[in-house]
């Protein structure tokens, strides 16, 4: 595990968890930032000593449980994870661990002759198997045998709440939990080779012990389908994707699992339509692109031609890694570029299509364009694009596993994530920043149509969109749409469609709903950004985040690039299938 992040020590985490926010703010005002950083690094060094101690305990674990350290597999005791032993694998993903834990428990139960059925639990990121209380002893023995194949952890739960520390299956504490737990959280711990990405019981297979009551088997906690079943209810076999929104429904076949008919039916909240992703990307370091850009006059505002807007820091590589890790249900990725391809891109991957600007602009006179508003106005013209899709810039990242329901309702409505930031109130002026000018133009059009004055901007998080609504907007506002699509650089007459106008228009016409997302916005030019990146890496608690650079004057590019590369490679160490294998490691 990396030891360079001062925000990642257990002591700093405990301080933030236990000390009220108001008191922490008072401390921050009184203690200089430099001194706080020194103290955090000191705590981190103490954490390294703790890591050495835990590695020594890992050596003792090797002697105590030699069967856990098989030839050809690397295992390590990892700090910050309760001294758990993690299986180190070249490829680690939340869905992969979820499936592996389900396979592990299903195999153990079937080999022991224990009847079970899968249940639709309240979390899409874990699997759940129900067994009869009368089979508890057999289940315990099966899990002990299961531990012979690798480090398997158990954790007793009441409802969704853990009631004990994780314990190795087969250990004294593990046996105790298996004898008494109403719900037994079961699974392995996986780590990538760098130790930066560690996944554990958040992707477990939970074993529920259902008790007999009035001739029925009764669940020990709520689930999404039923409180009880008949012991004789017929079993059916369904794909795992039927039981969770996190599975890759439209991209690959998932294993099947045994369940009861009540759990096999589609539920009203299930999103069953395909969802694509669209990226727009430019390599501002490309000499040919720079020559094309310099042949035309710049934008009206310094920010519209700010070089920082076009700097490529390899964000796309890591945004795709984030997508593959945290949204395996995405059907297809469309990468919109100006005839460019990253050298590392595996553009022959069947789930990736590179789309040139010329394929979506009907009027050749509009090209070349260096205006993101113009490019975004043509996204719905991508051939083969699904009706429902997410639009991302390469500075947007999924920070933890998400489901389709985080962005869409099952009836097709899109979720809108409003920002606390506001569209400035004065009328448009040449001094407006491009984003503010477009927001004001959006406001004027929406006021004319719907009689409401929009105030809030949108979070710079993945935008949930519908192709048909974008087509409707082009028909509804033909002049503004045409003018935006033909503005070679950002212009004071632009409208911003997928990042703002769409969401209000869809809301006013009953096709979008305001929603929340755990989100963080970071600007590389801000002095506190290194600390915030460290906190984000230590916690990994945001569903999405954006790392932007709108304020940089270009003098600090090298330092920012190094800082961002260190952060992204630690947050997303596992290459995606969209990278060429021979150049995937970085």
From Swiss-Prot:
EC number(s) stated in the UniProt entry for this protein: 2.7.-.-
A single MF term (Gene Ontology): transferase activity, transferring phosphorus-containing groups
Positions of disulphide bridges: none
Keywords assigned: Exopolysaccharide synthesis, Transferase
Any single biological process term in GO: polysaccharide biosynthetic process
InterPro entries: Stealth (IPR047141), Stealth_CR1 (IPR031358), Stealth_CR2 (IPR021520), Stealth_CR3 (IPR031357), Stealth_CR4 (IPR031356)
Superkingdom, natural source: Bacteria
Family label: Belongs to the stealth family.
Additional observations: Stealth proteins are part of a protein family that is conserved from bacteria to higher eukaryotes. Family members were first identified in microbes as proteins that help pathogens to elude the host innate immune system. Microbial stealth proteins are involved in the biosynthesis of exopolysaccharides. Stealth proteins are predicted to function as hexose-1-phosphoryltransferases.
Protein name, entry field: Exopolysaccharide phosphotransferase SCO6023
Organism expressing this protein natively: Streptomyces coelicolor (strain ATCC BAA-471 / A3(2) / M145)
Organism ancestry: Bacteria, Bacillati, Actinomycetota, Actinomycetes, Kitasatosporales
């Amino acid at each position: 595990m990396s030891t360079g992040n001062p925000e990642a020590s257990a002591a700093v985490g405990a301080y933030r968890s236990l000390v009220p926010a108001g008191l922490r703010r008072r401390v921050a005002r009184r203690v200089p930032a430099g001194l706080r950083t020194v103290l955090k690094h000191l705590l981190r060094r103490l954490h390294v000593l703790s890591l050495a101690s835990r590695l020594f305990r890992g050596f003792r674990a090797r002697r105590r449980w030699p069967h856990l350290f098989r030839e050809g597999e690397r295992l390590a005791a990892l700090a910050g994870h309760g001294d758990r032993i993690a299986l180190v694998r070249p490829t680690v993903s939340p869905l992969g661990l979820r499936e592996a834990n389900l396979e592990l428990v299903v195999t153990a139960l079937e080999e022991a002759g224990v009847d079970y059925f899968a249940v639709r639990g309240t979390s899409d990121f874990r699997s759940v198997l129900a067994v009869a209380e009368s089979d508890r002893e057999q289940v315990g023995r099966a899990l002990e045998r299961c531990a012979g194949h690798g480090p398997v952890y158990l954790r007793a739960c009441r409802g969704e709440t853990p009631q004990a520390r994780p314990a190795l299956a087969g250990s004294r504490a593990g046996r105790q939990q298996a004898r008494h737990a109403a719900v037994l959280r079961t699974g392995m711990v996986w780590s990538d080779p760098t130790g930066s990405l560690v996944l554990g019981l958040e992707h477990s297979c939970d074993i529920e012990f259902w008790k007999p009551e009035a001739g029925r088997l009764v669940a020990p906690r709520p689930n999404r389908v039923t409180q009880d079943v008949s012991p004789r209810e017929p079993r059916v076999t369904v794909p795992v994707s039927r039981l969770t929104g996190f599975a890759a429904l439209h991209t690959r076949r998932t294993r099947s699992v045994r369940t009861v008919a009540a759990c096999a039916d589609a539920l009203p909240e299930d999103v069953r339509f395909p969802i694509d992703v669209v990226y727009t990307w430019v390599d501002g370091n490309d000499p040919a692109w720079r020559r094309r850009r310099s042949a035309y006059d710049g934008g009206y505002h310094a920010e519209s031609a700010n070089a920082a807007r076009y700097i490529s820091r390899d964000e796309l590589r890591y945004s795709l890694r984030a997508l593959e890790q945290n949204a395996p249900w995405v059907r297809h990725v469309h990468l919109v570029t100006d005839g460019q391809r990253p050298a590392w891109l595996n553009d022959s991957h069947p789930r990736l299509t590179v789309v040139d600007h010329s394929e979506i602009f009907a009027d050749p006179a509009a090209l070349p364009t260096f205006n993101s508003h113009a490019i975004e106005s043509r996204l719905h013209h991508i051939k083969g694009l699904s009706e429902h899709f997410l639009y991302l810039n390469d500075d947007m990242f999924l920070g933890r596993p998400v489901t389709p329901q985080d962005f869409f309702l099952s009836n097709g409505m899109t979720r809108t994530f409003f920002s606390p930031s506001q569209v400035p109130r004065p009328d448009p002026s040449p001094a407006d920043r491009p984003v503010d000018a477009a927001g004001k133009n959006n406001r004027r059009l929406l006021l004319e149509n719907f009689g409401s004055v929009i105030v809030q901007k949108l979070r710079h998080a993945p935008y949930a969109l519908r192709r048909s609504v974008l087509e409707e907007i082009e028909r509804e506002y033909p002049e503004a749409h045409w003018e935006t699509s033909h503005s070679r650089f950002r212009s004071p007459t632009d409208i911003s469609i997928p990042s703002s106008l769409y969401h209000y228009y869809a809301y006013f016409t009953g096709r979008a709903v305001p929603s929340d997302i755990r989100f963080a916005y970071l600007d590389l030019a801000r002095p506190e950004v290194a600390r915030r990146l460290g906190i984000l890496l230590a916690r990994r608690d945001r569903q999405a985040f954006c790392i932007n650079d709108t304020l940089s004057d270009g003098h600090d590019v090298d330092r920012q690039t190094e800082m961002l590369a260190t952060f992204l490679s630690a947050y997303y160490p596992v290459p995606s299938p969209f990278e060429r294998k021979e150049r995937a490691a970085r």
